Amino acid sequence: MCTKIRLWAMVAGWIISTPCLAQGDPNVTRENAQLRQRVETLEKQVEQLQATVKPPAAEPAPVPAPPAAAGLEPGKKPFWSTLDIQFYGYIKLDAAWDSSGVNPGDYVLFTERGREGDDEFNLTARQTRLGLKIQGPSTGNMKASGVVEADFYGSAGAENKPNLLVRHAYMTFDWPEDKFSILAGQTSDVISPLYPNTLNYTVLWDAGNIGYRHPQVRLTQQLSVGNDMTLELAGAISRTIGDAELLNPAFTPGANAGFPTLQGRAGLTYPWFGFKPTVIGVSAHWGREQYSSDEKFDSWSLNLDVLQPICPVVTVKGEAYVGANLDDYFGGIGQGVRTRTVGGTTLFQKAIGDRGGWFAVTLGPWDAWSFNVGAGLDEVESEDVDALARTSNRSLFANAIYALNKSADIGVELSQWRTDFKNADDVDDVRIQTSFIYKF
Protein backbone atom coordinates (compact mmCIF):
# COMPACT_ATOMS: atom_id res chain seq x y z
CA MET A 1 0.00 0.00 0.00
CA CYS A 2 2.84 2.43 0.82
CA THR A 3 4.56 1.69 -2.53
CA LYS A 4 1.36 2.48 -4.39
CA ILE A 5 1.07 5.85 -2.63
CA ARG A 6 4.64 6.83 -3.55
CA LEU A 7 4.01 5.91 -7.21
CA TRP A 8 0.93 8.13 -7.37
CA ALA A 9 2.92 11.00 -5.84
CA MET A 10 5.66 10.74 -8.51
CA VAL A 11 3.09 10.76 -11.29
CA ALA A 12 1.39 13.79 -9.77
CA GLY A 13 4.73 15.68 -9.53
CA TRP A 14 5.54 15.01 -13.13
CA ILE A 15 2.12 16.17 -14.26
CA ILE A 16 2.40 19.40 -12.25
CA SER A 17 5.77 20.24 -13.84
CA THR A 18 4.52 19.97 -17.44
CA PRO A 19 2.81 23.48 -17.61
CA CYS A 20 6.24 25.13 -17.34
CA LEU A 21 7.19 23.47 -20.58
CA ALA A 22 4.18 24.61 -22.63
CA GLN A 23 2.75 27.89 -21.42
CA GLY A 24 2.15 29.35 -24.88
CA ASP A 25 0.06 26.60 -26.36
CA PRO A 26 -3.73 27.02 -25.73
CA ASN A 27 -4.33 23.33 -26.21
CA VAL A 28 -1.65 22.57 -23.75
CA THR A 29 -3.14 25.06 -21.32
CA ARG A 30 -6.51 23.33 -21.54
CA GLU A 31 -4.93 19.96 -21.07
CA ASN A 32 -3.00 21.28 -18.08
CA ALA A 33 -6.23 22.48 -16.48
CA GLN A 34 -7.74 19.04 -16.95
CA LEU A 35 -4.63 17.43 -15.54
CA ARG A 36 -4.65 19.70 -12.46
CA GLN A 37 -8.25 18.70 -11.83
CA ARG A 38 -7.27 15.05 -12.08
CA VAL A 39 -4.31 15.64 -9.76
CA GLU A 40 -6.55 17.25 -7.16
CA THR A 41 -8.84 14.24 -7.40
CA LEU A 42 -5.87 11.91 -7.01
CA GLU A 43 -4.58 13.86 -3.99
CA LYS A 44 -7.93 13.49 -2.26
CA GLN A 45 -7.87 9.76 -2.99
CA VAL A 46 -4.32 9.54 -1.59
CA GLU A 47 -5.42 11.32 1.60
CA GLN A 48 -8.30 8.89 1.94
CA LEU A 49 -5.95 5.94 1.42
CA GLN A 50 -3.53 7.28 4.04
CA ALA A 51 -6.38 7.64 6.51
CA THR A 52 -7.36 4.02 6.03
CA VAL A 53 -3.82 2.68 6.40
CA LYS A 54 -3.18 1.56 10.09
CA PRO A 55 0.06 0.33 11.60
CA PRO A 56 0.10 -3.45 12.32
CA ALA A 57 -1.20 -4.38 15.77
CA ALA A 58 1.42 -5.33 18.32
CA GLU A 59 1.57 -9.03 19.22
CA PRO A 60 0.13 -9.76 22.69
CA ALA A 61 2.62 -10.56 25.40
CA PRO A 62 2.85 -14.28 26.15
CA VAL A 63 0.83 -15.45 29.16
CA PRO A 64 3.20 -16.58 31.90
CA ALA A 65 2.91 -20.26 32.84
CA PRO A 66 1.44 -20.94 36.28
CA PRO A 67 4.02 -21.80 38.91
CA ALA A 68 4.61 -25.53 39.36
CA ALA A 69 3.10 -27.13 42.45
CA ALA A 70 5.50 -27.50 45.31
CA GLY A 71 7.52 -30.67 45.03
CA LEU A 72 6.44 -31.42 41.44
CA GLU A 73 8.54 -31.33 38.30
CA PRO A 74 7.36 -28.91 35.57
CA GLY A 75 4.76 -30.51 33.31
CA LYS A 76 3.61 -33.13 35.83
CA LYS A 77 0.10 -33.20 37.31
CA PRO A 78 -0.60 -33.32 41.05
CA PHE A 79 -1.38 -36.84 42.33
CA TRP A 80 -4.95 -35.90 43.29
CA SER A 81 -5.79 -35.09 39.66
CA THR A 82 -5.24 -38.76 38.71
CA LEU A 83 -7.83 -40.10 41.20
CA ASP A 84 -11.62 -40.17 41.26
CA ILE A 85 -12.60 -39.42 44.87
CA GLN A 86 -16.23 -39.56 46.03
CA PHE A 87 -17.31 -38.30 49.44
CA TYR A 88 -20.37 -40.08 50.84
CA GLY A 89 -22.21 -40.84 54.06
CA TYR A 90 -25.26 -39.84 56.02
CA ILE A 91 -26.36 -37.88 59.06
CA LYS A 92 -28.53 -39.94 61.43
CA LEU A 93 -30.37 -39.08 64.62
CA ASP A 94 -31.83 -41.92 66.70
CA ALA A 95 -34.41 -41.41 69.45
CA ALA A 96 -35.34 -44.58 71.37
CA TRP A 97 -37.42 -45.56 74.39
CA ASP A 98 -36.93 -48.94 76.11
CA SER A 99 -39.30 -50.47 78.64
CA SER A 100 -36.40 -52.17 80.47
CA GLY A 101 -32.70 -51.60 80.93
CA VAL A 102 -30.64 -52.55 77.87
CA ASN A 103 -26.97 -52.77 77.00
CA PRO A 104 -25.53 -50.37 76.02
CA GLY A 105 -28.48 -47.95 75.55
CA ASP A 106 -28.08 -45.95 72.34
CA TYR A 107 -28.55 -49.31 70.62
CA VAL A 108 -29.52 -52.76 71.92
CA LEU A 109 -27.38 -55.89 72.13
CA PHE A 110 -29.26 -57.57 75.00
CA THR A 111 -31.23 -56.68 78.14
CA GLU A 112 -29.53 -56.33 81.51
CA ARG A 113 -30.17 -58.71 84.40
CA GLY A 114 -32.25 -57.23 87.22
CA ARG A 115 -33.53 -54.23 85.21
CA GLU A 116 -36.97 -55.48 84.20
CA GLY A 117 -39.29 -52.44 83.96
CA ASP A 118 -36.43 -49.94 84.40
CA ASP A 119 -37.29 -47.88 81.33
CA GLU A 120 -34.85 -45.49 79.65
CA PHE A 121 -34.74 -42.94 76.82
CA ASN A 122 -31.73 -42.34 74.55
CA LEU A 123 -31.07 -39.69 71.91
CA THR A 124 -27.92 -39.80 69.80
CA ALA A 125 -26.34 -38.81 66.47
CA ARG A 126 -23.36 -41.14 66.86
CA GLN A 127 -24.31 -43.38 63.92
CA THR A 128 -23.63 -40.48 61.55
CA ARG A 129 -21.30 -41.95 58.93
CA LEU A 130 -18.59 -40.39 56.74
CA GLY A 131 -16.68 -42.10 53.95
CA LEU A 132 -14.43 -41.75 50.92
CA LYS A 133 -14.48 -43.96 47.82
CA ILE A 134 -11.29 -43.69 45.79
CA GLN A 135 -10.86 -44.97 42.22
CA GLY A 136 -7.65 -45.23 40.19
CA PRO A 137 -5.14 -45.15 38.84
CA SER A 138 -5.52 -48.23 36.64
CA THR A 139 -2.64 -50.13 35.07
CA GLY A 140 -3.35 -52.40 32.13
CA ASN A 141 -6.32 -54.57 33.04
CA MET A 142 -5.84 -53.98 36.79
CA LYS A 143 -8.08 -51.49 38.57
CA ALA A 144 -7.17 -50.05 41.96
CA SER A 145 -9.64 -48.61 44.46
CA GLY A 146 -9.97 -47.88 48.15
CA VAL A 147 -12.51 -47.08 50.86
CA VAL A 148 -12.18 -45.22 54.15
CA GLU A 149 -15.29 -45.03 56.36
CA ALA A 150 -15.98 -44.07 59.96
CA ASP A 151 -18.79 -43.31 62.37
CA PHE A 152 -18.82 -41.87 65.91
CA TYR A 153 -19.31 -44.97 68.04
CA GLY A 154 -15.69 -45.00 69.19
CA SER A 155 -15.04 -46.10 72.76
CA ALA A 156 -15.26 -43.57 75.60
CA GLY A 157 -16.16 -39.95 74.86
CA ALA A 158 -19.20 -38.10 76.18
CA GLU A 159 -22.49 -38.39 74.31
CA ASN A 160 -22.12 -34.89 72.86
CA LYS A 161 -18.37 -35.36 72.26
CA PRO A 162 -18.13 -38.82 70.68
CA ASN A 163 -14.95 -40.42 69.41
CA LEU A 164 -14.35 -41.61 65.88
CA LEU A 165 -14.63 -45.33 65.07
CA VAL A 166 -12.91 -46.60 61.93
CA ARG A 167 -15.26 -49.02 60.17
CA HIS A 168 -13.50 -49.61 56.87
CA ALA A 169 -10.00 -48.76 55.66
CA TYR A 170 -9.00 -50.99 52.77
CA MET A 171 -7.69 -51.11 49.21
CA THR A 172 -8.73 -53.43 46.39
CA PHE A 173 -6.72 -54.54 43.36
CA ASP A 174 -9.14 -55.96 40.82
CA TRP A 175 -8.53 -57.82 37.55
CA PRO A 176 -12.05 -57.84 36.00
CA GLU A 177 -11.06 -59.90 32.95
CA ASP A 178 -9.74 -62.64 35.22
CA LYS A 179 -12.53 -62.20 37.81
CA PHE A 180 -9.88 -62.06 40.52
CA SER A 181 -9.25 -59.49 43.25
CA ILE A 182 -7.01 -58.83 46.24
CA LEU A 183 -8.27 -56.84 49.24
CA ALA A 184 -5.97 -55.53 51.96
CA GLY A 185 -7.09 -53.54 54.99
CA GLN A 186 -9.91 -53.50 57.53
CA THR A 187 -13.42 -54.39 56.39
CA SER A 188 -16.26 -56.86 57.03
CA ASP A 189 -15.42 -60.49 57.65
CA VAL A 190 -15.59 -63.11 54.91
CA ILE A 191 -17.95 -65.26 57.00
CA SER A 192 -21.69 -64.56 57.26
CA PRO A 193 -21.76 -61.57 54.87
CA LEU A 194 -25.48 -60.70 55.08
CA TYR A 195 -27.30 -58.45 57.56
CA PRO A 196 -30.91 -57.40 58.22
CA ASN A 197 -32.13 -53.86 57.49
CA THR A 198 -32.70 -52.55 61.01
CA LEU A 199 -32.74 -49.01 62.36
CA ASN A 200 -31.02 -50.37 65.46
CA TYR A 201 -27.28 -49.85 64.93
CA THR A 202 -26.15 -53.42 65.59
CA VAL A 203 -28.20 -55.40 62.99
CA LEU A 204 -29.08 -58.30 65.38
CA TRP A 205 -25.50 -58.74 66.64
CA ASP A 206 -25.49 -60.91 69.78
CA ALA A 207 -29.00 -61.96 68.72
CA GLY A 208 -28.26 -64.45 65.92
CA ASN A 209 -26.16 -62.47 63.43
CA ILE A 210 -22.38 -62.99 63.62
CA GLY A 211 -19.55 -61.37 61.67
CA TYR A 212 -17.78 -58.10 62.36
CA ARG A 213 -14.85 -56.15 60.84
CA HIS A 214 -11.16 -57.09 61.09
CA PRO A 215 -7.83 -56.18 59.46
CA GLN A 216 -7.30 -58.78 56.74
CA VAL A 217 -5.77 -59.81 53.42
CA ARG A 218 -8.39 -61.42 51.18
CA LEU A 219 -8.28 -63.21 47.82
CA THR A 220 -11.48 -63.62 45.78
CA GLN A 221 -11.97 -65.65 42.59
CA GLN A 222 -15.19 -65.97 40.58
CA LEU A 223 -15.73 -69.04 38.38
CA SER A 224 -18.40 -69.85 35.80
CA VAL A 225 -19.62 -73.38 36.55
CA GLY A 226 -22.56 -73.70 34.17
CA ASN A 227 -25.34 -71.83 32.45
CA ASP A 228 -26.08 -68.72 34.50
CA MET A 229 -24.23 -70.18 37.50
CA THR A 230 -21.30 -68.50 39.26
CA LEU A 231 -19.15 -69.84 42.07
CA GLU A 232 -17.31 -67.28 44.21
CA LEU A 233 -14.41 -68.46 46.36
CA ALA A 234 -12.99 -66.12 49.01
CA GLY A 235 -10.25 -66.74 51.53
CA ALA A 236 -8.56 -64.43 54.04
CA ILE A 237 -6.14 -64.19 56.90
CA SER A 238 -7.38 -61.80 59.59
CA ARG A 239 -6.40 -60.34 62.95
CA THR A 240 -7.41 -62.41 65.99
CA ILE A 241 -8.77 -60.35 68.89
CA GLY A 242 -9.39 -62.10 72.22
CA ASP A 243 -11.66 -61.41 75.21
CA ALA A 244 -9.12 -59.64 77.39
CA GLU A 245 -7.95 -57.47 74.50
CA LEU A 246 -11.35 -55.80 74.38
CA LEU A 247 -10.84 -54.61 77.98
CA ASN A 248 -7.06 -54.17 78.03
CA PRO A 249 -5.47 -53.40 74.63
CA ALA A 250 -2.01 -54.06 76.11
CA PHE A 251 -2.92 -57.74 76.52
CA THR A 252 -3.14 -59.41 73.09
CA PRO A 253 -4.02 -63.12 73.28
CA GLY A 254 -4.80 -63.13 69.56
CA ALA A 255 -1.33 -61.93 68.60
CA ASN A 256 0.23 -64.19 71.25
CA ALA A 257 -1.05 -67.24 69.34
CA GLY A 258 1.60 -66.55 66.70
CA PHE A 259 -0.59 -66.90 63.60
CA PRO A 260 -3.71 -65.22 62.14
CA THR A 261 -7.31 -66.36 61.92
CA LEU A 262 -8.28 -68.16 58.71
CA GLN A 263 -11.60 -67.31 57.02
CA GLY A 264 -13.19 -68.78 53.90
CA ARG A 265 -16.45 -68.81 51.98
CA ALA A 266 -17.88 -70.50 48.89
CA GLY A 267 -20.94 -68.78 47.41
CA LEU A 268 -23.08 -70.10 44.55
CA THR A 269 -25.28 -67.77 42.48
CA TYR A 270 -27.83 -69.52 40.27
CA PRO A 271 -31.39 -69.08 38.94
CA TRP A 272 -33.74 -71.04 41.18
CA PHE A 273 -36.97 -69.09 41.40
CA GLY A 274 -37.92 -65.46 41.66
CA PHE A 275 -37.00 -62.61 39.39
CA LYS A 276 -33.31 -62.55 40.43
CA PRO A 277 -30.80 -65.35 41.08
CA THR A 278 -30.56 -67.13 44.41
CA VAL A 279 -27.32 -66.82 46.39
CA ILE A 280 -26.32 -69.56 48.84
CA GLY A 281 -23.04 -69.47 50.74
CA VAL A 282 -21.15 -71.69 53.16
CA SER A 283 -18.39 -70.12 55.25
CA ALA A 284 -16.12 -70.94 58.17
CA HIS A 285 -13.35 -69.50 60.32
CA TRP A 286 -10.73 -70.81 62.72
CA GLY A 287 -8.34 -68.99 65.03
CA ARG A 288 -6.66 -69.34 68.41
CA GLU A 289 -6.24 -67.19 71.50
CA GLN A 290 -3.34 -67.73 73.91
CA TYR A 291 -3.65 -66.27 77.40
CA SER A 292 -0.71 -68.16 78.90
CA SER A 293 1.35 -71.21 78.09
CA ASP A 294 -1.45 -73.39 79.49
CA GLU A 295 -4.47 -71.32 78.41
CA LYS A 296 -5.14 -71.68 74.68
CA PHE A 297 -8.65 -71.57 73.23
CA ASP A 298 -9.85 -72.01 69.67
CA SER A 299 -12.39 -69.70 68.01
CA TRP A 300 -14.34 -71.31 65.17
CA SER A 301 -17.61 -71.19 63.27
CA LEU A 302 -19.47 -72.93 60.46
CA ASN A 303 -22.06 -70.75 58.71
CA LEU A 304 -24.82 -70.80 56.10
CA ASP A 305 -26.20 -67.71 54.32
CA VAL A 306 -29.13 -67.47 51.86
CA LEU A 307 -30.38 -64.52 49.80
CA GLN A 308 -33.57 -65.04 47.78
CA PRO A 309 -35.32 -62.24 45.85
CA ILE A 310 -38.95 -63.34 45.40
CA CYS A 311 -40.24 -60.47 43.27
CA PRO A 312 -39.30 -56.80 42.75
CA VAL A 313 -40.84 -55.83 46.11
CA VAL A 314 -40.12 -58.91 48.26
CA THR A 315 -36.67 -60.23 49.30
CA VAL A 316 -35.96 -62.92 51.90
CA LYS A 317 -32.55 -63.49 53.49
CA GLY A 318 -31.07 -65.17 56.53
CA GLU A 319 -28.13 -66.94 58.15
CA ALA A 320 -27.43 -69.75 60.62
CA TYR A 321 -24.26 -70.74 62.46
CA VAL A 322 -22.64 -72.98 65.04
CA GLY A 323 -19.29 -72.42 66.76
CA ALA A 324 -17.38 -71.52 69.90
CA ASN A 325 -15.61 -68.50 71.41
CA LEU A 326 -17.47 -66.06 69.14
CA ASP A 327 -17.65 -62.87 71.20
CA ASP A 328 -15.25 -61.10 68.81
CA TYR A 329 -17.75 -61.85 66.01
CA PHE A 330 -20.78 -60.72 68.06
CA GLY A 331 -21.76 -64.28 68.94
CA GLY A 332 -22.17 -65.95 72.32
CA ILE A 333 -24.25 -62.97 73.53
CA GLY A 334 -20.96 -61.19 74.13
CA GLN A 335 -19.31 -64.19 75.87
CA GLY A 336 -16.31 -66.01 74.43
CA VAL A 337 -14.23 -67.77 77.10
CA ARG A 338 -15.48 -68.81 80.55
CA THR A 339 -13.42 -67.14 83.27
CA ARG A 340 -13.01 -67.45 87.02
CA THR A 341 -11.30 -65.01 89.37
CA VAL A 342 -9.30 -66.43 92.29
CA GLY A 343 -7.40 -64.15 94.64
CA GLY A 344 -7.59 -61.27 92.19
CA THR A 345 -6.27 -63.39 89.32
CA THR A 346 -8.48 -64.12 86.30
CA LEU A 347 -8.33 -67.70 85.09
CA PHE A 348 -9.57 -68.58 81.60
CA GLN A 349 -11.28 -71.97 81.70
CA LYS A 350 -13.29 -72.92 78.62
CA ALA A 351 -14.40 -71.71 75.17
CA ILE A 352 -18.18 -71.13 75.22
CA GLY A 353 -20.16 -73.09 72.62
CA ASP A 354 -22.75 -71.14 70.64
CA ARG A 355 -25.39 -71.48 67.91
CA GLY A 356 -27.98 -69.19 66.36
CA GLY A 357 -29.38 -67.51 63.30
CA TRP A 358 -31.72 -64.89 61.90
CA PHE A 359 -34.06 -64.19 58.99
CA ALA A 360 -35.58 -61.02 57.54
CA VAL A 361 -38.03 -60.00 54.84
CA THR A 362 -37.77 -56.70 52.96
CA LEU A 363 -41.01 -55.35 51.46
CA GLY A 364 -41.02 -52.52 48.95
CA PRO A 365 -40.39 -49.95 47.94
CA TRP A 366 -43.97 -48.91 47.26
CA ASP A 367 -43.93 -45.26 46.23
CA ALA A 368 -41.94 -43.74 49.10
CA TRP A 369 -42.49 -46.58 51.60
CA SER A 370 -40.39 -49.64 52.47
CA PHE A 371 -40.79 -52.17 55.28
CA ASN A 372 -38.62 -54.76 57.05
CA VAL A 373 -39.56 -57.53 59.46
CA GLY A 374 -37.38 -60.22 61.01
CA ALA A 375 -36.16 -62.16 64.02
CA GLY A 376 -32.92 -63.48 65.50
CA LEU A 377 -31.81 -65.93 68.20
CA ASP A 378 -28.46 -66.56 69.92
CA GLU A 379 -28.11 -69.50 72.33
CA VAL A 380 -24.97 -70.57 74.21
CA GLU A 381 -24.27 -73.94 75.83
CA SER A 382 -25.64 -73.58 79.35
CA GLU A 383 -23.00 -75.88 80.86
CA ASP A 384 -20.24 -73.65 79.44
CA VAL A 385 -21.21 -70.57 81.49
CA ASP A 386 -21.44 -69.73 85.17
CA ALA A 387 -24.60 -68.93 87.12
CA LEU A 388 -26.23 -65.59 86.25
CA ALA A 389 -24.54 -65.54 82.82
CA ARG A 390 -26.57 -64.94 79.65
CA THR A 391 -27.79 -68.16 78.03
CA SER A 392 -30.24 -67.00 75.34
CA ASN A 393 -31.04 -63.75 73.53
CA ARG A 394 -33.97 -63.27 71.15
CA SER A 395 -35.18 -60.31 69.11
CA LEU A 396 -38.22 -59.59 66.92
CA PHE A 397 -38.37 -56.39 64.87
CA ALA A 398 -40.48 -54.52 62.32
CA ASN A 399 -39.85 -51.12 60.80
CA ALA A 400 -41.30 -48.70 58.27
CA ILE A 401 -39.18 -46.17 56.39
CA TYR A 402 -40.61 -43.22 54.45
CA ALA A 403 -38.47 -41.41 51.86
CA LEU A 404 -39.16 -37.67 51.92
CA ASN A 405 -36.96 -37.42 48.82
CA LYS A 406 -33.97 -39.28 47.37
CA SER A 407 -31.75 -38.10 50.26
CA ALA A 408 -33.98 -37.78 53.33
CA ASP A 409 -35.70 -40.64 55.22
CA ILE A 410 -37.77 -40.95 58.39
CA GLY A 411 -38.14 -44.37 59.99
CA VAL A 412 -39.93 -45.98 62.93
CA GLU A 413 -38.97 -49.37 64.38
CA LEU A 414 -40.66 -51.54 66.99
CA SER A 415 -38.63 -54.40 68.48
CA GLN A 416 -39.04 -56.89 71.32
CA TRP A 417 -36.06 -58.36 73.18
CA ARG A 418 -35.77 -61.21 75.68
CA THR A 419 -32.55 -62.26 77.38
CA ASP A 420 -32.41 -65.41 79.54
CA PHE A 421 -29.95 -65.85 82.40
CA LYS A 422 -28.66 -69.02 84.06
CA ASN A 423 -30.43 -69.52 87.39
CA ALA A 424 -32.04 -66.04 87.18
CA ASP A 425 -35.18 -64.43 85.77
CA ASP A 426 -35.25 -63.43 82.12
CA VAL A 427 -35.69 -59.75 81.20
CA ASP A 428 -38.02 -58.52 78.43
CA ASP A 429 -37.80 -55.18 76.67
CA VAL A 430 -39.98 -53.33 74.17
CA ARG A 431 -38.09 -50.72 72.16
CA ILE A 432 -39.61 -47.93 70.07
CA GLN A 433 -37.09 -46.11 67.91
CA THR A 434 -37.43 -43.20 65.50
CA SER A 435 -34.64 -42.30 63.08
CA PHE A 436 -34.04 -39.25 60.90
CA ILE A 437 -31.57 -39.87 58.06
CA TYR A 438 -30.04 -37.49 55.52
CA LYS A 439 -27.90 -39.26 52.88
CA PHE A 440 -25.26 -37.68 50.65
What function would you assign to each model-found segment?
Residues F259, G264, Y270-R390, R394:
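Detector for outer-membrane/organellar transmembrane beta-barrel domains
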Residues D98, P137, F152-G157, T187-P193, ...:
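Sequence/structural signature of outer-membrane beta-barrel proteins
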Residues S17-P19:
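N-terminal signal peptide c-region/cleavage motif recognized by signal peptidases
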Residues E73-D243, G258-P271, L307-C311, K317-V322, ...:
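Outer membrane beta-barrel
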